[in-house]
Amino acid sequence: MMSSRTKSALLLFAHGSSDPGWAAPFVKLKAAIQARDKDRFVELAFLERMPPSFGEAVAILQQQGAVEITVAPIFLAIGGHMRKDLPALIEAAHQRTGIKFRVLPALGESGEMIESIAAWVVHASDRDG
């Protein structure tokens, strides 16, 4: 159960795909985060081609009582979606709800993430195939 101090939420934001199976790793990531952080609401949103949309996910989090949302873009690099689309979605959601938003950097901006990916690639490539 969430603590009474829970007013913040985490919104994982990914691109989306017309292939429903594409979302499976993101659903697993959401579950892993929820298991580690039981004091925040966690939701998943997609830019296009699959639900929930950014606006739909924000509405879900607002209904749960969130007044602050940290957006975690699940993009390896900063491109047009992070430079243009995401800020526009956040501004529209803020105007509609009054919720305060904070955006984490793209995954590739994290040295820790780059090291984790590098370690995984080396380890996976060394396995007998």
Label the model's feature ranges.
Residues 1-129:
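Active-site-proximal alpha-helix that buttresses catalytic centers in soluble enzyme cores
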